A protein has these predicted regions:
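Short, surface-exposed helix/turn micro-motifs that flank interaction/cofactor sites
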Residues: 17, 35-36
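A short, exposed loop/beta-hairpin motif centered on an aromatic-Gly-Thr core
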Residues: 22-31
Length: 68
């Protein structure tokens, strides 16, 4: 599955979250680090959902850019 992620640059770090998986977040010192961490976090999050016996949410979010 391919989930959309949002990456935000802070003053000293990068943060990432997955709109389709509430609570699935990661923080890293660089963009490459946060991308690695969010991938691991998604895998861990999905495993937890499976273990609970819950249904895994299908990816439904998408991203677009708007020029202003």
């Amino acid at each position: 599955m391919r989930y959309a992620i949002i990456v935000e640059k802070g003053e000293t770090s990068y943060g990432a979250y997955v709109p389709d998986l509430p609570g699935c977040v990661a923080v890293g010192k660089s963009k490459s680090e946060v991308l690695k961490l969010i991938r691991e976090t998604i895998e861990f999050h999905l495993e937890g959902i499976k273990q609970e016996g819950s249904k895994i949410p299908l990816p439904s979010s998408s991203t677009e850019y708007v020029e202003v």
